Each structure stands twice: as structure tokens, then as C-alpha cells.
């Protein structure tokens, strides 16, 4: 597995179609589709500021990361995600995905999250505000999920 650490990327698709990659302390700046059409990706202690960073990604781990407001619509059309200890300030996360594990995650703009998702295993998720979470989703297992008004 290739390791990229302590750097930043911006612009359009800087990590397009990469496989078997671990990112440590990486910042994804403004731009679109930074990590598109990838597989076997790990992001640890990373920050996502640009739109659509994880689209069409198959098999990935996101641990101790932060999704800034600009990182909207970050996780779409992907599968086999394990996300832990992460804070999300961006809206419209998790769309048309399956096989998702979430643990110790806080979503501060829960507008339109988890739409058309299948096979979700959720532990300790906090949703703040937003409308229509889990629209058209199925096969959901939850432990300690709270929806808080902002």
C-alpha cells in the first residue's frame, strides 16, 4: 500500500483512479472529485475542503477526519466504507451507497444525509439539523443515534 502524508492537493481529480493508498494528515483543498474511481483507500487524520472527494470508491476507511462545509456531497456512489471518529460540517453526505459502518461520527449539517443507502451499521452517530435523513434507505442497524436540532 502506497502512503502519502503531510501534504495537500487541490484542483480537479488529483488522486483519480488510484488503488491501495493510505493518506495520513492530507488536506484536500478546493476542487472536485479528488478521490474518484478508487479502491482500497485509507484516510487518517485528513481534512476535506473540496467538493465530491469520495465518488465511486470501493472499499475505504475514514478515521479521525474532518469534512469542512466546502466538502459537500463528499460520499456518493461508493461502497464498503468504515468511518470512525470523524466530524462532518458539510451537507448532503452518503448518497446511493451500500455496506457502511459508522462509529463515533458527528454530522453538523444533516441535510439530506444517507439517501438511498443500504446495509448501514451505525454506532454513536449524532445528527444536527437537516431534513429527510435516511430517505429511501434500508437495512439499517443503529446503536446510540441521536438527531439534535440546531
Model-derived segments and their meaning:
Residues 26-27, 44, 57, 61, ...:
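Extended aliphatic helical segments
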